[in-house]
Amino acid sequence: MSASETSSNHPPRVRVAPSPTGDPHVGTAYVALFNRTHARQGGGQFLLRIDDTDRSRYQATSEDQIFHALEWLGLNWDEGPDKGGPHAPYRQSERLEHYQSLIERLMASGHSYRCFCTADRISELREDQKANKQRLGYDGACREISAEDSERRARDGESHVIRLKVPNSGETVFKDRLRGEIRVSNAEIDDQVLIKTDGFPTYHLANVADDIS
């Protein structure tokens, strides 16, 4: 299911969100089957969303293959790229302005930051962590760069990503429908990349943002 809340007062609104990076696989059919059934039984909607933010693996023909595979299985959708709907567009590559507005809010509130570390540095960091049997993850080297310096470097064209700024202390708590209350120390949560160097969002941002909306 998606992150959309369902209850007796709100019909379920669920989705399947495959990535057009190759041939359709059984996982897509599995999710579509269960979510479509859930939507139909609850009088809700079943959506098809195309998660096409991984441009390095994107295959133009894969989207049509996804459509045909789901139609062949009889798993028709109510809203999607080919049908439209009240929350269009349903391709993530066509929603970049929406993600950018969210990032601007996160940056302004201090919940995200630009990271100028090169791919080589990140690779070396991970190798060092493996060699020293340390927890893998970003070391926060760019967390304390001033806003002025960060903006200047970005204006100068220096390559960067935008990361989530996870608090150094405390814990994150949420309720899982199956497992109940889950508590995770913030020290164990990585500063995940939200926007890549090409300006496209990662799964961590786009998937959550679209499920909520």
PLM region descriptions:
Residues 113-213:
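Active-site cores that bind ATP or allylic diphosphates and position pyrophosphate for catalysis
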Residues 1-6, 147-151:
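A short, compositionally biased domain-edge/stem linker segment
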